[in-house]
A protein has these predicted regions:
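Mid-domain alpha/beta scaffold segments of enzyme catalytic cores
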Residues: 1-221
């Protein structure tokens, strides 16, 4: 990656073990920073001891720049929604306490995500709606809570009409290009392992949507 134009990486934890690996990478490489948090897929392994550990790392480690990936995933409804709501709220509370922005995973859970963010004072810290997948009508709600919109390879897919419509109305200064490595590689590499070198394809598609040059996208994002 260092042979490309990528010079700084925020590696995002999702599982407890993933957070440990992310912290080790951030310690090993000066250009890698860490986001730590537990994804809804792993909420059944979460407890207050883990929350305390995450909080201590966020407070004491200057290379921890965000809390995430946290949120809700109702696509499979596992674990059950009550469990997801509990640990999303708890991790958001912790993020506000340590004053770190959040990286939000939200899949088919727009209303509950918005309610928790509003009730949890997420506007104080802001963050990113990772892999934004909701409508253009929801953009203003997240925007008003100081969130950025993560856009990656999905933007290049043929069935991405809803995301294209949202991208049209998201202000350029609130778009954050992301990889979601190793998933969701953009066309023409869809189905292959994704990495940050593929961001150029997202840039090209976004420039087409925004009717500007790729260079303008790079400068803005």
């Amino acid at each position: 990656l260092l042979s490309t134009d990528i010079d700084t990486i925020v590696n995002v934890g999702a599982s407890i073990e993933g957070c440990r690996k992310t912290l080790n990478l951030a310690k090993q490489y000066k250009n890698i920073y860490a986001a730590i948090g537990v994804h809804p897929d792993d909420y059944d392994k979460l407890n207050e001891d883990i929350i305390s550990w995450l909080k201590e790392e966020a407070l004491s480690n200057p290379k921890v720049v965000a809390i995430g990936e946290i949120g809700l995933d109702y696509y499979y409804d596992e674990p059950e929604r009550a469990v997801q709501l509990k640990w999303f709220e708890r991790q958001l509370q912790m993020a506000v306490e340590v004053n770190k922005p959040v990286i939000i995973h939200s899949r088919e859970a727009c209303a509950d995500t918005i309610n928790i963010l509003k009730n949890g004072n997420a506007d104080r810290i802001g963050g990113i709606i990772h892999c934004y997948s909701y409508t253009k009508e929801s953009v203003k709600t997240f925007y008003d809570m100081n969130f950025y919109f993560g856009i990656g390879g999905v933007l290049t897919f043929k069935n991405a009409r809803k995301l294209v419509e949202a991208a049209e109305v998201i202000p350029m200064e609130r778009i954050l290009l992301e990889t979601d490595c190793p998933y969701l590689a953009p066309v023409p590499n869809r189905g292959k392992r994704n990495d940050s070198s593929n961001i150029r394809y997202v840039i090209e598609k976004l420039a087409e949507i925004k009717k500007c040059t790729p260079e303008e996208i790079v400068r803005a994002t």
